[in-house]
Amino acid sequence: MFYVWILIGVVYLDYASSPIRPVLIVTCRTSSVALCEHEIGNVLFIKDPDVRVEKTAFTDVLLVYSNLDVNTAYRVASFREYGFVESIIPIHCTSTLPVDPLFLRKCLAEITSPGTRVKLKVRARGVRKTSSEIYRLVVNILRELGIAVESSSSTCLFVEVIKSSVYVGVGSCKPVFKASISDS
């Protein structure tokens, strides 16, 4: 069970009081959201019967809530064949806009290591100009932490903004659906 607080018209979810929290962002093949929702839900249900998959305000984008640790959920979900899931992004850290540089620095220090090479993918849905500002901020923090940004890296650092929520995670750059098709 989690608590919802409403403060000045903004809803805050207290994930600390509940083990269920956002662990994955899933993008779906165009016009296949219902099937994609069932696919990802069925895969994770085996490990977590409380898994919840929610549509976002954006076409073909889902948020997955689970009791599982983010790395376990990502591992379970990533190594499956899918017909309708396009990509799976782990959520290691969450925040809200505007992004606090101290939060971002702490998050990036926890999920990366000095000497690591990452491909940086920043996507802001529903907020103009935010992605370029966040991109610059993340690049500067990564530089301070001794992490190289390389477009050829197979490890991606994802920073996803959905409305006013910011999700940060590290995972494979390989899209799940496309990987399954090309590997067969």
Regions found by a protein language model. Give the residues of each.
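SAM-dependent transferase fold signal centered on methyltransferase-like domains
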Residues: 2-184
